[in-house]
Amino acid sequence: MRSSAPMPRMSRRGRVTIGVLVGVFVLFTLLGWGVQAWTDWLWFGEVDYTAVFSGVLVTRLLLFVTVGLAMAVIVGGNLWLAHRLRPRLRPQSPEQATLERYRMLLSPRIGLWFATVSVVVGLFAGLSAQSRWSEWLLFRNGGNFGVKDPEFGVDIGFYIFDLPFWRYLLGTAFTAVVLALLGALAVHYVFGGIRLQGVGDRMSTAARAHLSTLVAVFVLLKAVAYVLDRRTMLLEYNDGANVYGAGYADINALLPAKEILAYISVVVAIAVLVFSNAWMRNLVWPGISLALLGVSAVAIGGIYPWAVQTFEVKPSARDKEARYIERSIEATRAAFSLGEADATRYAASNLQPPASLATDTAVVPNARLLDPQLVSETYTQLQQVRGFYDFGPKLDIDRYTVDGETQDYVVGVREINYGELTTQQSNWINRHTVYTHGYGLVAAPANRVVCGGQPYFVSGFLGERSQEGCAAQTDQIPASQPRIYYGERMEAGDYAIVGKANPEASPAEFDRPVGEDGSESYYTYTGSGGVEVGSFGRRLLYAIKEQESNFLLSEAVNEKSKLLYVRNPRERVEKVAPFLTVDGDPYPAVIDGRVTWIIDGYTTAATYPYAERINLQTETTDELTNRGTFQQARENINYIRNSVKATVDAYDGTVTLYEFDDGDPVLRAWNKAFGGDLIKPKAEIPTELSAHFRYPADLFKVQRNVYTRFHVTNPGDFYSGQDFWQVPNVPDAPDSGQKQPPYYLFTQMPGQDEPRFQLTSAVTPNRRQNLAALMSGSYVDGKPRLEVYELPEDTRISGPVQVHQQMTNNAQIRQQLNLLSSNQAQVQYGNLLSLPFGNGMLYVEPVYVKSNQQQAYPLLQKVLLSYGDGGSFVVLADNLTDGIKQLVEQGEQAGAPSPPPSDDETPPSPTPTPTPTTPSVTPPPLTGEVAEAAQRVQAAIVELRAAQESGDFERYGRALQALDEATAAFEQAAASTPAATPTAAPTGSPSPGG
């Protein structure tokens, strides 16, 4: 029965219009892709990494075609088969009458419809598959780790290299079968193979055989999924123990359940085929079989493990989960390279400044006073010379040996900041052909200030004269090629066009100011970097890419021109090594006379069995993130290695990748994937370059944060969580919630033979503010070393936040700080350094002052120092030398230090510290009102100490206010009593904690 109503048809003009629009869209899309691919090929050719471009491109195309074609064939083949199996005769019914209209529409072009659906499905599947290029390359080129998982004895390499791609293939197979099943079901229904109305069998024999086969394949895939789930269980979170990896209930209940369900799935798949086609030939028993599978999955795979977890594990979780917590601890320490951390006890029992502070040559002289974040503004104002030069929001720390002395320097490069060009300077010609580069690496010793608090600059001069004593008169870190064409300030659109057609023509690029008269020199780029854009075809290509007609119209682009782009060092490394996670803080160094950017590269994975999984962005974010350091992507990982040290030449952009961790299987797999020679072996690292390697910041932050929990190796203690640590907040702004960044120092830690350049950080116990440990990362003989100095649990040594508050809340010091901040000047605090010394702890915190004048910059004016518990011995001095002298004097006046306490004793309180101005004569006794006032001061001091030890900051504030009031009352009483001399002060310093 056919309907008399014809189906609407589109007019010829409408079809032509749609065809033209689709054609234009496809043309422009292909043009954009083509231009991007061509320019990428040229760029990779410039940096000599075409193997990466071609390898990734070929892999993506291979996956796109293979998976897309397979998906199209599976879906399209089942659509064709369903149509091929349609019944020739269909009983008449209202349902079939309605479907007849659709059959009339589809039948004339049924092949076209099936092809269209297949192409669309294949296109989406291919696009999804091509993004899995990294998983495929690791699957093809991965090897063994040489370490087996603790449950199945399978090499870790299977989980890192094979399992991710197997899971993707399984997911793709599920998608293909489901789409084929839905498509076949629809075709069978439209063409009468399935009927919802009428009498007799509702499904033809052919349709039943077809659909039951697809269902059986789906169930067989589910069996494979159950098998893979057994391996995947070692990667999942264990709520019962708060660690990753299979726990007691997983191993003893869920693991056998998965195996049983896999067997049941195979049986059900066979039953579906047999009951649907060979025996009974209906859907009742296949339906019952599928229902039994569902019930089994709920009962065996859900209820049973839940019951074991609830009634067997939870009542004694500490004991039941101990074995699996131990697995997680061992795996996590291995995956994050924490197993080799050298943990030692540091008693820190000396609470009084030792006399050796004044004669030390390893720790005190190397205490860094310049904060690379604060003095960036100072560098810009004093070394900018022109308004468009910039040093960025944060400088870097490196070490150099000058005149036989090695120390750390604050370094920065004078880059072009295109955002600071004036309106006249920022036209296309000036922006891209004149202001093309910066000039010079500017450095200053990190422990020295001159001329009212300025850094003592020793390099990067532009020929200007500096006041004698305020800067070195000769370049102490000379660079034979100081020009900066590639730097951190470069963004996506900051390309430069260099080169001149006529060798006799005057240089067009602004080079640098010369002399005191404001004259300028110009320059022509002669480096090997850049893509040649002299031909018309190349100029047209980049005109399309940059959407800029001046590539074709401007005379500044000539036959000798080169285009420099992707000029950010970090982005260059990411582009040539897309398999690396790049550290967020590149730093410059002068290597063989050239300014070179050094960037740390990490290999990561997320499928290390039993290892803790972290979010890389969360674990590396602190106060400096997006303030001079790049923020990492939100990537979940549970394995990381600093496998590569990369360099980028600041002049010609040359990118070099050096192997640093020669034992990393992940790096070996990537190197193999790209021909085996992509990364230079470790033996080829130049000695001068390796001398500037530093422990990478992001890796250290990850290791530090993970170690705050996984330093606990006893499963029972780990489960209770009582010994966990935390990273303290920024000392001078604890309420901001930002974590204190680690800091680089050239210093000597306890047990070290000589000073090293190391990255250090303090950690505190959970929910407490005293110091728990110091962590240090450094290189010894070219190998990374992580060291931890753990303090006793009952230590009185304060943590960074507490120390800063104790120092700045000292009555005398607070008065001086208030004077510094008068006239709306800003008092800014530099890095608070925690330095183990003399079996105690020395704290150093530089104090900067920035006036309220326009274009003012921070100047180092004072240095806060503390020794011991953080509050008993505190000074605010003009410089480090004077501060150390005052600390030593306080220690001498306080008397000989008490012997270290035994393990079962509480460390004795130090003798109260007299103020530096207190004479050593015995004061006369106090009487009357003065004596009462003195007693109130003493009582306030006792309360202040108690509040400090309790860690209750609200109580501490009240006690501090009471001390101020008592001190003021005492001074007033002493002034009104002639017999009371200034020496008749109450015993005990009124400083916090004193």
UniProtKB/Swiss-Prot annotation:
InterPro entries given in the database record: UPF0182
Parts of the chain that traverse the membrane: 18-38, 61-81, 110-130, 174-194, 209-229, 260-280, 283-303
Any single Pfam family the record assigns to this protein: UPF0182
Cell compartment(s), UniProt: Cell membrane
Domain of life: Bacteria
Family membership noted in the UniProt record: Belongs to the UPF0182 family.
HAMAP family, sorted: UPF0182
The protein, known as: UPF0182 protein Strop_3729
